[in-house]
Amino acid sequence: MANDELMTNDEGRRVMFRHSDFVILSSFVIRASSFLLLIFLPALRAAEKVSILGSKPKWSVLEHYQETITRDEFAHLINDVYCTHGFAPDLIEINEKTARILLNRETQKCFTLRFAENDASRRPVPRLWRPAESLPRAKPERPLSSLRIALDPGHLGGKWAKMEERWLHVGDGAPVQEGDLTLGVARLLAPRLRKLGARVFFIRSSNEPVTAKRPDDFQELARKILIKNGVPQPRVDVLDPNDPEKEQTIRWQSEILFYRYSEIRRRAALVNFKLHPDLVLCLHFNAEGWGDPNSPTLLDTNHLHLLVNGSYLEDELEFDDERFEMVRRLLSRAYNEELPLADMVAKAMAKETQLPPYEYPTTLTTTKVGTSGYVYARNLLATRIYRCPVVYCEPYVMNSNDVFARIEAGDYEGMRNVNGVERKSIFSEYADSVADGLADYYSKARGL
């Protein structure tokens, strides 16, 4: 399940906080970034408005992208991919030869991006990752040779799973913890990708957090957030898991700051400043609302979808750092690589798993893209701040009867009758289908 500003499918369990003109939905939520506003960055000038644990944007970086994109391509990516829900007219102004991008509202300063006159006059796009077309020649049996892939097993698992609310337990069986499941898939996927020629790196290789921070490091910030959002005397601790006001406690908010924001931003630092991959694969399992995790509701529902970055909300674009990150990502052309890649992986996963595509109940946060019917654009923290193409996989509903039975069966070699059907383990099926999709894409893109 998505682990930054939102949960993927369950919008029912949520608590609203209001601040200024923003509606904040916490827990299983649409967005929480406006929840923190500016109060967590006192060192910045009042004119700068940044998202949760974000940094002042370095707009000068965009100078490197001058004349690397035509007006038509820029307008297409803005209107059809990144800003499909619209944006305030003063944020981005697209003219014939330039685009003016607002740096911040208080100063009304803008960055001016110059367009290339045509495709032939475009300057090379500066980036550390390499699109498939620029990779060295490869042998047909090793379509991923020279490719640098970072595996990002979603969530934490282990002792952190209950805190993350990525944990459910049925009867006498072992608890199902998404962070454990995704790490298991990553460990199966890595040798498959290496056999195909890739260099593979783990962003998370254990059930311990990547960030050095812990919830206690965010208690004072959590207290300020709650006071700012109308809770004048916030309680320190949650009374019990069913506490109806747990979202209004310092403990609950400090935990979110730890596992949702600090953790993902630390993973991004590894991706952007150490690993420099050509591709990040975010591995997740999905879920529907399950109620009490000690007595969860099991369903017959099961589905698959993948995510790429895009579909920013108007409120999200009001944050200077999110607007900057969106424009930088657009100019890097990550979308041109990650969408066809996601489509190919989706087709391979659909073929292997026989799962139908997930259909979001609303289009308020997503935009369906591509040709497979399985891929959506959505503005997740990881897909936004990892500075390379990102394919975010969301197969299997963990609390479906069938998936739960397969998870309880564990990993095994070959085929086995599970829940009345002869099949691979769910972990091997996941790993095989992703590897097959990558092989298909890079074989085609590299002309093998």
Named regions from a protein language model:
Residues 36-46:
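Hydrophobic h-region of N-terminal signal peptides that target proteins for export
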Residues 46-448:
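Catalytic-site microenvironment of enzymes
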